[in-house]
Amino acid sequence: DQGDTPYNLRNCAYMEDFFKPKITWGNLNLKGTYSYVQKGMFINAPSPFIVTSNIAILHILNSKIADYYIRSLGVTRNGGYFEYKPMFVEKFPIPQTGLDSLELYPINPSKEQEKEIDDIIYQLYHLSMQEIEYIENRES
């Protein structure tokens, strides 16, 4: 799309979103890795993002179940790389209740906390032990 002048190639209707807190990720990765960008901070490279300050969503997207689900929507490329397109990430269902306990964890949890977070998320999605074992033991 083109802006108001030949020098303004884009009149960005969502410009204010760049100033808001957001979750961002690299498009091409070996596994889904999402990062939190605080209000007023900017992303230095082209990458998709979701405008939210909800840390629970960050933890859900970084979970094993989210990676499993999102990878099921696309194709893995050479070397095991997967393109985490926004249209795939947008399709992942986020529970509307039970997120409070996830917000208590830090933005960068320890390995032990990551395991606790995954356990909470498995409960949020009502996974059986068999489903949990499958996700935990699958090859990425």
Tell what function each PLM region has.
Residues 1-100, 123:
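Polybasic, glycine- and aromatic-enriched phosphate-binding surface used to engage nucleic acids
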Residues 94-140:
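Non-catalytic DNA-recognition/assembly elements of restriction-modification systems
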